[in-house]
Amino acid sequence: MKRREFFKSAVVSLAAVSYPSWKGYADDNTIPIEIPAVTGSRQPIAIERIAVEEFRKSLNGRLLLPEDDDYQVARLVRNRSIDKRPALIAQCRNSEDVQACVNFAHHYQLLTAVKCGAHSVSGKGTCDGGLLIDLSPLQGVSVNPTKRRIFVTGGSLLGRLDEATLPLGLGTTAGTVSHTGVGGLTLGGGFGRLGRRFGLTLDNLKSVEIVTADGQLRYADAEENSELFWGVRGGGGNFGVVTMFEFQLHPMNPKVVGGRITYSFSQVKDLLRFYGEHSVKAPVELYYDPVIFAPPMGFDKMVYFDVCYSGPLDQAEKVLKPLYSAGKVLKDNLETIDYMTLQKSGDDDDPRGASQYLKGGFITDVTSGLIDTLVDNLEAHPTRGSMAFFQQSGGAINEVPADTTAFPHRYANSNLITGSFWPYGVDTAPHIEWSRRYWRKVDKFTKGFYTVDEFSESQQQVNKNFLGNYDRLVKIKNQYDPTNLFRLNANIKPTITAG
């Protein structure tokens, strides 16, 4: 069977997945005659009730309005400091639902957001007064172990991918937190514990099905709609809503050595210096993230390495020995573990269920100036946890030329992230201000940023961040989204006036 035919059969089989039934609106008089909303340019409009009802009837999934019982839960994202209220939430069950949403949004020029795993720290997976296209019901996977391919629907979480492939002795790069949405991670880049072996998640993308701004469902790969396929690999959600991903899989032992090594904080600068020197020459099977953390409630500051070694197990001791020699070990919980278990190990610790603020940038060298800035300015606080950590890059990620995909940052050896989190419901302003001050001191050591972590960058910064790929991305935007319907992202603004 040809790959394209298998892709189509996978779409059919995944579309047949059943979902829980839902109760429609109890009574017509619970819906206002007109629904207040906003356009992409933030202009207020009113949508006729009859149009909303027709839209609702066209969907296989649910359409939620603010008065509906499930609306308050459906509007939430993982960063609890984001408190937005869409005018409509469409919970899509298939590609046809997504097409209906895009056509409806295009007709009314609605502000449009797309949500998968709700991990967008900047809140771009939701909106105030617009249409939220919620892909969370659109979950399913189909594996072709012979061809080493997996087909993943647009609302799926990374854990579904790992669960389907690892028992078959196959794997691919899929982040570090299992409840991350596959869409946002893939379209922006896709770092992960296997990235140094297999490349970014987007480097393993072989094809997509995508609903573009004209409501058309298009197939794109290296041969068909090849420019669109190039653009979605790093251009984020600028060109449409991906409803199906096809990924390359690789042979992989589902057993790895992973966990955490915690060191004495008195050696934190030496440990970061070690990381800067050792990580760039470490085997590609070794991935480790150094974390410096100032916990809330007066607990001592911490420094630790989160580790994953996915190479031959009989070589693990030799490969990991330098990490044990890097500093005074206070706690060691490295063990031979199922990779799937390791992928889920940080789910409960992930701060994205609290209020938070993150900033990030790419690093080529871990200099003494950077180390001093990170450590000396990390501030303890009674209610705020603050941290800085490195996502290790290099290896297969950096072997790809900068213009092979739209993701240009192949020079980076690490993605540095700083951030803070605090309890939901407390005043966010002082915590955000501290986070911004901390980042301003760190930013001068970075070069470019990961668009998945983009928070408040200016349009000029976003444009510049695509480096030599920007002009090509603008041409693709002009072709597939000339009205900038998909603007809640690291936005590539079209340069033509749509007819």
Label each residue range with its predicted role.
Residues 2-499:
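Soluble FAD-dependent oxygen oxidases
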